[in-house]
Design a protein with these regions (language model features):
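A late-sequence structural motif
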Residues: 41, 195-237
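Central regulatory/effector-binding core of bacterial HTH transcription factors
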Residues: 26-89, 152, 160-161
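Secondary-structure junction motif
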Residues: 111-113, 119-121, 129-151, 219-227, ...
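Alpha-helical "hinge/linker" immediately C-terminal to small N-terminal DNA-binding modules
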Residues: 1-26
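Short, well-ordered beta-strand segments
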Residues: 28-32, 80, 104, 132, ...
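Short beta-strand-centered segments that line the small-molecule binding cleft or hinge
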Residues: 21, 44-48, 65-106, 114-115, ...
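Hydrophobic hinge/microswitch elements
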Residues: 64-77, 82-83, 139-195
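Beta-alpha-beta core module
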Residues: 88-95, 99, 165-215
């Protein structure tokens, strides 16, 4: 399978080179993106790209981050947008956005009366609290656990879910407190049912990176342009 990817990639790279010599009239750019992240990132990114390269065919592959890394390692993609950390750290990557986590508190939670005048809270306010978190193999869970390290386990996880959207909806139904990436807090708006607080002096962020199948210096012109667009857009969208 690895060699099949490599042969296909060689053919597409040759097509892209001819495309560059012919004012970008044709070519294929294979982009990987993790589930959910695609709907948040790609619309405005690809709209700008299509304006400049209207005849480049975009082949979008949506899979889990590890699957995308494996495809990159085998040459099956030109680039992928994934969150860190990487399973294959030898792949060239560049962070283009860092998303802070927020404390999501249900509107009717009794502690809201204590916190309601504040915009940011120390993570220590979560001591002894019942929390909703994504499952252990999810990268959002890994980041949440890093944020919670100062508590030394002094909290109780009452519900786990594969989906961060499910966690947000459960928190909005007064099921417990959660830690939510800011971009998802904006994407899955629950109105006034959730109160969000920033975390004081928290160095931990959810890092998003563009990962390449080879040295970024060897990227085709359209690939470089897509990377440039990613670097210039200010997220969260």
């Amino acid at each position: 399978m690895k060699y099949a990817y490599q042969i296909q990639k060689m053919y597409e790279e040759m097509s892209m080179e001819f495309c560059e010599l012919n004012q970008m009239k044709k070519g294929v750019l294979r982009i990987g993106v993790t589930e959910r992240m695609g709907s948040l990132l790609l619309p405005q990114v690809l709209e700008r790209f299509r304006t400049k390269y209207p005849n480049i065919q975009l082949d979008i592959v949506e899979k889990g981050g590890v699957d995308l890394e494996e495809m990159l390692a085998k040459g099956g993609l030109d680039m992928a947008l994934v969150s860190l950390p990487l399973k294959y750290p030898s792949l060239p990557s560049h962070v283009f956005y860092e998303d802070p986590f927020l404390i999501a508190v249900p509107k009717d939670h009794p502690m809201n009366e204590v916190w309601k005048e504040k915009e940011a809270l120390p993570v220590t306010v979560l001591k002894g609290q019942e929390l909703l978190l994504t499952r252990r193999f999810k990268k959002t869970r890994l980041i949440a656990e890093q944020i919670l390290e100062p508590l030394k386990g002094d909290y109780r996880i009452i519900t786990e879910s594969y989906s961060i959207e499910t966690i947000i909806r459960l928190a909005a139904e007064n099921m417990g407190i959660s830690l939510v990436p800011e971009i998802y807090a904006k994407a899955y708006d629950c109105g006034d049912r959730l109160q969000y607080y920033r975390i004081e002096n928290c160095p931990v962020t959810w890092k998003w990176a563009v990962v390449f199948s080879s040295d970024p210096q060897n990227l085709t012109r359209p690939s470089k342009e897509l990377y440039k667009i990613l670097s210039l857009i200010h997220f969260p969208v």
